[in-house]
Curated annotation (Swiss-Prot):
Entry protein name: Troponin T, fast skeletal muscle
Phosphotyrosine, modified sites: 229
Record-listed N-acetylserine modification sites: 2
GO cellular component terms, A-Z: troponin complex
Region of interest (Disordered), residue spans: 1-82, 121-200
Pfam short name (any one): Troponin
Keyword Transcription: no
Superkingdom per UniProt: Eukaryota
Keyword line: Acetylation, Muscle protein, Phosphoprotein
Positions bearing Phosphoserine: 2, 98, 169, 176-177, 213
One GO-annotated biological process of the protein: sarcomere organization
Length: 279
């Protein structure tokens, strides 16, 4: 028996139940109408109308018969209910499958987005690395060019000095002694500079404050401040002393120049004839 035939049988069965509910009981159908006491004043037409209505009510209604089911076939309502449940389950399963497919698609899109972000981040890091490497190469190239130029300048100056020395050495031995003296003076200056560096290195001790506490750090800072203040005071006093010394030297030079002028004038006025000749 096909599904369409089963549904058709179900519809006929439901229509039969509704008709039986709406149909009146046999007692109501065959119950005689009550007698009506009509007053004498009522017109005969009204009586006839009432009789016609009573006759219509007393007419028997057609009996409803159940639909005929083909012989050899039985309607299994459990099977119908089971099919409905299976249909609902299939629809629910389809909804669940579509939900999980959409969720799986969203997860795949999220994974693809993360992969694109990671790829872009790696590309950006690679670009930064290449840019930094190029910048490093450029700095190295500039440093090499600078060192090469300095080396060429030093070589050129050395060649020029050598040419000057050769040209001047050909002029005589006197210049060689002059060069020796100049080299000696230069050596003395370098020695004095080295001595100054050595003295400063001895005076300037390394500041080791990693192991000190807060109180000792404050004491050390106060000590350094006092030392700096004393150095500035000494510097100011030495500057003032140097100014006074320069002023005294200028005064002495002015007096010496004035005395030299007066002595020259006195020498010219004291000239005279001594021993038959002018002095």
């Amino acid at each position: 028996m096909s599904d369409e035939e089963v549904e058709h049988v179900e519809e006929q069965y439901e229509e039969e139940e509704e008709a039986q509910e709406e149909a009146p009981s046999p007692a109501e159908v065959h119950e005689p109408a009550p007698e009506v006491h009509v007053p004498e004043e009522v017109h005969e037409d009204a009586l006839e109308d009432m009789r016609e209505e009573e006759e219509e009510e007393e007419k028997p209604r057609p009996k409803l018969t159940a639909p005929k089911i083909p012989e050899g076939e039985k309607v299994d309502f459990d099977d119908i209910q089971k099919k409905r449940q299976n249909k609902d389950l299939m629809e629910l399963q389809a909804l669940i499958d579509s939900h999980f497919e959409a969720r799986k698609k969203e997860e795949e899109e999220l994974v693809a987005l993360k992969e694109r972000i990671e790829k872009r981040r790696a590309e950006r890091a690679e670009q930064q690395r290449i840019r930094a490497e190029k910048e490093r190469e450029r700095q190295n190239r500039l440093a090499e060019e600078k060192a090469r130029r300095e080396e060429e300048d030093a070589k050129r100056r050395a060649e020029e000095d050598l040419k000057k020395k050769k040209a001047l050495s050909s002029m005589g031995a006197n210049y060689s002694s002059y060069l020796a003296k100049a080299d000696q003076k230069r050596g003395k200056k370098q020695t004095a500079r080295e001595m100054k560096k050595k003295i400063l290195a001895e005076r300037r001790k390394p500041l080791n404050i990693d192991h000190l506490s807060d109180e000792k750090l404050r004491d050390k800072a106060k000590e350094l401040w006092d030392t700096l203040y004393q150095l500035e005071t000494d510097k100011f006093e030495f500057g003032e002393k140097l100014k006074r010394q320069k002023y005294d030297i200028m005064n002495v030079r002015a007096r010496v120049e004035m005395l030299a002028k007066f002595s020259k004038k006195a020498g010219t006025t004291a000239k005279g004839k001594v021993g038959g000749r002018w002095k």
